[in-house]
Design a protein with these regions (language model features):
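Short, charged N-terminal helix-start/capping segments
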Residues: 1-5, 86-89, 95-102
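Residue-level signal for pocket-adjacent positions within structured domains
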Residues: 49, 89-90, 138-140
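N-terminal glycine-/serine-/threonine-rich phosphate-binding loop
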Residues: 1-65, 69-79
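Short, glycine/serine-rich, charged loops/turns that create anion-binding
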Residues: 10-11, 89, 99, 144
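Gly/Ser-rich helix-loop-strand patches that form or flank binding pockets
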Residues: 72, 77-94
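Glycine-rich loops and low-complexity Gly/Arg-rich segments
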Residues: 29-33, 57-60, 87-89, 109-112, ...
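Catalytic core of DAGKc-family lipid kinases
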Residues: 94-155
Length: 155
């Protein structure tokens, strides 16, 4: 694997210093990298990444941030069928499994095709009011149904 697209989290890598280190590391080893431009807020249905901006030959998307960044990126690029790997720049990550201190061995494994792709389930949830569809969205792994309204305490 040698063609990567990088999605940074501007709150966790504001100067793109960590992103730059990853790009330099990969490019020094012959890989090609493209970086998602950082914008205030994306227009339309995408929050981090417009999938149309990802080069067609991309083999892997590297998501820098945490679980939230990875979850949103998965939603944004769901129709592109490109594997994602999350690099955790925070304190604890369950989905973003690669810790920032062990990023280089993980990148080496990607470059040498020493990895397994783990398939994850994408779900679509729809909200109806009567027969009217009032909302829908997609999610990675699970959808939580909650109740909105007044908090009631029972004695």
């Amino acid at each position: 694997m040698d063609r990567f697209y990088i999605i940074p989290n501007s709150a966790k890598d504001p100067e793109l210093a960590f992103s730059g280190m990853i790009i330099a590391y990969l490019e020094q080893r012959g890989a090609r990298c493209h970086v998602q431009p950082i914008t205030e807020k994306m227009e339309g249905p995408y929050h981090y990444t417009d999938p149309d901006g990802i080069p067609e030959d991309t083999q892997c998307i590297i998501v820098l941030g945490g679980d939230g960044t990875l979850l949103q990126a998965a939603r944004d690029v769901v129709h592109r069928d490109i594997p994602l790997i999350g690099i955790n720049l925070g304190t604890l990550g369950f989905l973003a499994e690669v810790d920032k201190n062990s990023v280089y061995p993980a990148l080496d494994r990607l470059l040498s095709d020493d990895y397994e792709v783990e398939e994850r389930m994408m779900l679509e949830g729809k909200i109806y009011h009567g027969n009217d569809l009032i909302g829908k969205d997609i999610a990675l792994n699970d959808i939580v149904i909650g109740r909105e309204g007044h908090l009631r305490v029972i004695r």
